[in-house]
């Protein structure tokens, strides 16, 4: 598989035709979300919290605004385009990303008892449960290219590439 089989969303680069890269056909591709960097430009914030978990204000499904981690907004946007197979490349100190995408039924039950169950969290968990999520470990921060190559070793065929620290606003 050569570079022509990789669609890079974060830079809107595509080696495929415009029709193949349209949102209507994205469901055919798995998505590789790179989150292995150490976030030196965001220190001291990124020392303890992964930059991909930075809170942003994003539209929810009902067009209301909601505070959510950047990587969640990216996941939901790809999910909305039909993607159901996700590969996350994570590095040291990125356990918060894996935890965030691991549904916690006990936490939802706790919130229900307090009558504070946010529908958006239930919606996120439903999306996660209807998707395939795989976490790949980048043992040392060797850059974006290394993260893409790690994905290439396990993903068969063409795949989408999205950096977890770059958000593209959809229409």
Language-model-derived ranges and their functions:
Residues 3-4, 8-112:
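N-terminal glycine-rich phosphate-binding loop and ensuing alpha1 helix
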Residues 97-99, 107-112, 117-171:
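Conserved beta-loop-beta/alpha segment of the NTase-like Rossmann-fold superfamily
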């Amino acid at each position: 598989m050569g570079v022509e089989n990789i669609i890079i969303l974060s830079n809107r680069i595509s080696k495929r035709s415009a029709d193949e890269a349209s949102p209507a056909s994205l469901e055919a591709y798995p998505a590789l979300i790179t989150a292995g960097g150490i976030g030196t430009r965001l220190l001291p914030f990124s020392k303890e919290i992964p930059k991909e978990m930075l809170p942003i204000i994003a539209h929810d499904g009902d067009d209301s605004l909601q505070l959510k981690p950047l990587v969640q907004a990216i996941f939901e946007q790809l999910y909305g385009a039909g993607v159901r197979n996700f590969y996350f490349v994570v590095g040291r100190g990125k356990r918060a990303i894996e935890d965030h995408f691991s549904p916690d039924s006990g936490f939802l039950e706790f919130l229900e008892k307090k009558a504070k169950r946010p529908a958006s969290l239930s919606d996120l968990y439903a999306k996660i449960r209807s998707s395939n999520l795989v976490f790949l470990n980048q043992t040392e921060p060797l850059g974006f290219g290394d993260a893409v190559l790690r994905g290439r070793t396990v993903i068969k065929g063409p795949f989408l590439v999205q950096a977890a620290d770059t958000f593209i606003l959809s229409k």
